[in-house]
Structures are given as structure tokens and as C-alpha cells.
Amino acid sequence: MQGRLSAWLVKHGLVHRSLGFDYQGIETLQIKSEDWHSIAVISYVYGYNYLRSQCAYDVAPGGLLASVYHLTRIQYGVDQPEEVCIKVFAARRNPRIPSVFWIWKSADFQERESYDMLGISYDNHPRLKRILMPESWIGWPLRKDYIAPNFYEIQDAH
């Protein structure tokens, strides 16, 4: 079984992998990092013009990092939204994923938070810098292999 977007991508020869459906019937697709920008543009044109959320997580210690996008398409009315979840995986050593800021402006702070917490660089993001941690912070706090410092110097907390 395929969702509408997945079927459309297959029909047009665009490489992706379906990871199945969740309990609400929302399909999850895996997209390669190098294909993400073009598929994001296609998704927007296809009608997925609302980015509900973007988040990221560490798949496993020493393993891949994932950036997750929840897209919504409202074609027949607000009571019948069509949703899709897209996962883009990146290597831990140099995690780079194309930014979708220029497609969905709401990705701005969400991609910055993923960068700040996990170190995923979003190519062509206009303001990719730390948003939660101080600029001087070393490391990526939400990575499973992150070693927390023995002390925290809170200078700017006033």
C-alpha cells in the first residue's frame, strides 16, 4: 500500500523508500539527503504547502542523525487534511541536509534548533547559528554520544 505522494513519486521516477504508516494512517517516507531539496519543492507544488513541524534525532550512538518533516496538504477542506512524514538521514561525521527555509519559512527556527542540539548543518539556511545554547558552547547536547561537561558556567543568565 502506498500513500498519494509516494505513488506520485514512483510514477515520476523519484527515488524514495516508504517506511510504512503510523496508527493514524500517515505514511513515512525516507528520502536521501541529496534528493531532499528537489522532492521538497515537488511536495510543495503538489500541495503540501504547510510544514507542521520539523525535528531531528540521533538514531543510535555512533550512527546516523535524522531530520524529520511533517507536511500537510489541505485540498478538500480543513477537516480532511492529507499528511506525510518525511525522514532525511545524514552521516554523523559531517551531517548536511539541504535547508527547506526557502520553501517553508516556518523551518527557520526549527532547523536552527536541530543544528544547535544535534549539529546537523542545513545548507543554504540564511541564519544557521545556535538558538538555545550560547555561541561558545562546545558539542551537540542531544547526541547520544555527547559527554556533558562537569560544570556549567552561567554568565549570561540575568
From Swiss-Prot:
Enzyme class, UniProt record, top EC level: translocase
Pfam families the record matches: Complex1_30kDa
Lineage, uppermost ranks: Eukaryota, Viridiplantae, Streptophyta, Embryophyta, Tracheophyta
Cited function: NDH shuttles electrons from NAD(P)H:plastoquinone, via FMN and iron-sulfur (Fe-S) centers, to quinones in the photosynthetic chain and possibly in a chloroplast respiratory chain. The immediate electron acceptor for the enzyme in this species is believed to be plastoquinone. Couples the redox reaction to proton translocation, and thus conserves the redox energy in a proton gradient.
Reaction equations catalysed: a plastoquinone + NADH + (n+1) H(+)(in) = a plastoquinol + NAD(+) + n H(+)(out); a plastoquinone + NADPH + (n+1) H(+)(in) = a plastoquinol + NADP(+) + n H(+)(out)
Subcellular location(s) of the protein: Plastid, Chloroplast thylakoid membrane
Family: Belongs to the complex I 30 kDa subunit family.
Highest taxon above the source species: Eukaryota
UniProt keyword terms in alphabetical order: Chloroplast, Membrane, NAD, NADP, Plastid, Plastoquinone, Quinone, Thylakoid, Translocase, Transport
Topological relation to the membrane, as annotated: Peripheral membrane protein
Subunit structure as annotated in this protein's UniProt entry: NDH is composed of at least 16 different subunits, 5 of which are encoded in the nucleus.
InterPro entries found in the cross-reference section: NADH_DH_suC, NADH_quin_OxRdtase_su_C/D-like, NADH_UbQ_OxRdtase_30kDa_su, NADH_UbQ_OxRdtase_CS
One Gene Ontology molecular-function label: quinone binding
Record's protein name: NAD(P)H-quinone oxidoreductase subunit J, chloroplastic
EC numbers: 7.1.1.-
A GO BP entry: photosynthesis, light reaction
GO CC, one annotated term: chloroplast thylakoid membrane
